[in-house]
Amino acid sequence: MDLAVNNLSLFFSAMLVVVALIISTKEKLGFTKDIIISVIRAVIQLVAVGYLLKYVFQVNNLILTLIMVLVIVSNAAFNAKKRSQQLQKGFLISFIAIGCSTGITIGILIFSGSIKFIPSQIIPISGMIASNSMVAIGLCYRNLDTLFQNQRQAVMEKLALGATIKLASLPIIQQSVKTGMAPTIDSAKTVGIVSLPGMMSGLIFAGVDPV
């Protein structure tokens, strides 16, 4: 099967963006500027990353591969941190969380023999793991901000009665973690029925037997 990007496919892709812009403008959602900037950034970033990955795959260097993974994790942590305006050391917390989840998962996959430590496998998988972690952490941060604002008085009363900061904040933290994990859990429940894993979809497009 020959898959190629042509002017017609690019035109129809652009039309999808136009539809989103029309809806945003008509319903006064305030997303018009964000959509335009996001699309422009996506195009520039994908083109740049395409050339960069082509070079990295050809060189097949251990240090360069690790640097690419570090860049992915750092960028994911930076974007997750922006979801909370109140959290101190948000970048560091996000970096450690995303770095640990990515490192542990990659380590298990390598030692189990599922993948090899080569750029063409490590970098895409690291990106998928870091992306999922970034979304979960971002949701958690946003929910933390909202709940602390709404329940500020209740938390202050608990502290006044002698509760520790951790104890007074525990229900809010638990609820925020649940909110952050909900999309991942829902995706896991419906995998294979509603959606296919990104890597599996890519292999199917490449003509590999789904089984």
Put a short name on every predicted segment:
Residues 3-16, 58-72:
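Structural signature of hydrophobic alpha-helical transmembrane segments
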Residues 5, 9-13, 64, 85-140:
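Loop-to-helix entry region at the N-terminal start of transmembrane alpha-helices
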Residues 19-23, 44, 48-56, 71-75, ...:
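Alpha-helical membrane-inserting segments
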Residues 21-33, 75-86:
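C-terminal ends of transmembrane helices
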Residues 30-61, 67-69:
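Loop-to-helix transition at the N-terminal end of transmembrane alpha-helices
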Residues 143-176:
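Short cytoplasmic-facing helical segments at TM-TM junctions of multi-pass membrane proteins
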Residues 166-197:
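Transmembrane alpha-helices
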Residues 191-211:
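Glycine-rich helix-loop "coupling/hinge" segments at transmembrane-helix boundaries
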